[in-house]
């Protein structure tokens, strides 16, 4: 209930939010050390996001400019979302965190993929990450923690530095 109240306080649309009485919401516990974070994820109710929930929100999803999905819901549901969005022409940003084995089809169907360096290595197990980034120019944006992001464009690797933010608790 507290999470729902906070979403309302920030004017976040909760029309398609599903609450379950027998399980807590998913949470992520973040530790920060020297500009890099480590995240412990407890899936909670997120583990129950399934095709029926996606279908129940499909009217809104199908009209979206971009749908962001990450590995904090069941992998089967990620596959369902990417396939359905690709068929409808809806762009998908796939954040493959936490790292997991994803189907190649889902990676192909995603418009953008935003792994960190470890997730990139898990998705594309080759030695040269620069080659992966270049080969997927316009698709893969690698998050580099305190170093910013890297992406491929015009046969080169481009990096955008991060900027300092003040972590907030609440």
Each model region followed by its residue ranges:
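Conserved N-terminal subdomain of the carbohydrate kinase-like
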Residues: 1-66
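Short, hinge-like loop/turn segments at secondary-structure boundaries
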Residues: 6-10, 32-36, 87, 109-113, ...
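Residues that scaffold the ATP/ADP-binding catalytic core of kinase and kinase-like folds
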Residues: 40, 123, 152
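Active-site donor-binding loop signature of nucleotide-sugar glycosyltransferases
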Residues: 42-44, 115, 162-164
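A short, aliphatic-rich alpha-helical micro-motif
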Residues: 58-62, 107-108, 134
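Conserved beta-alpha-beta core of the PfkB/ribokinase-like small-molecule kinase fold
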Residues: 66-131, 147-149
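Conserved phosphate-binding/catalytic region of the ribokinase-like
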Residues: 101, 128-170
């Amino acid at each position: 209930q507290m999470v729902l109240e906070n979403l309302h306080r920030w004017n976040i649309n909760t029309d398609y939010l599903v609450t379950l009485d027998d399980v807590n919401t998913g949470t992520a516990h973040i530790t920060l050390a020297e500009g890099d974070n480590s995240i412990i994820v407890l899936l909670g109710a997120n583990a129950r996001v399934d095709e029926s929930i996606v279908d129940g929100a499909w009217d809104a999803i199908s009209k979206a400019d971009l749908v962001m999905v990450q590995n904090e819901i069941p992998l089967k549901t990620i596959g369902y979302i990417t396939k359905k969005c690709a068929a409808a022409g809806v762009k998908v940003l796939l954040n493959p965190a936490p790292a997991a084995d994803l189907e190649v089809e889902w990676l192909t169907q995603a418009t953008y993929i935003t792994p960190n360096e470890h997730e990139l290595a898990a998705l594309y197990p080759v030695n040269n990450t620069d080659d992966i980034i270049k080969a997927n120019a316009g698709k893969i944006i690698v998050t580099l923690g305190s170093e910013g992001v890297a992406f491929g464009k015009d046969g080169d690797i481009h990096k955008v530095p991060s900027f300092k933010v003040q972590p907030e608790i609440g």
